[in-house]
Swiss-Prot record:
Family: Belongs to the CitD family.
A Pfam match: ACP
Entry-linked InterPro entries: CitD, Mal_deCO2ase/Cit_lyase_ACP
Protein name: Citrate lyase acyl carrier protein
GO cellular component, one term: cytoplasm
Amino acid sequence: MKIIKNATAGTVESSDIMITVQPIESTENTIELESSVEKQFGNQIRQVITTTLEHLDVQGVAVKAIDKGALDCTIKARMITVLHRGAEKETYDWKELDSWNV
């Protein structure tokens, strides 16, 4: 999936995460995380973000996440949404997404 524009999903309310993506001039992805629970769960949050990027074959994107205690399922849902918005895709491959739940 190719990200072609900046996009945002989520909120900064309690138990949520706001994720912003923007295309960059690189094949590498960058992740900037701001979280009140970063010391405890920062690695796990980054892992969920990275795994979602890999599943959707996204390269060359800068991800900024402002976490307020979101669960993994919320992070994954916000990532899927923001990436589809950034790629201007209006449909989801539900079978593909469901195959992640092994």
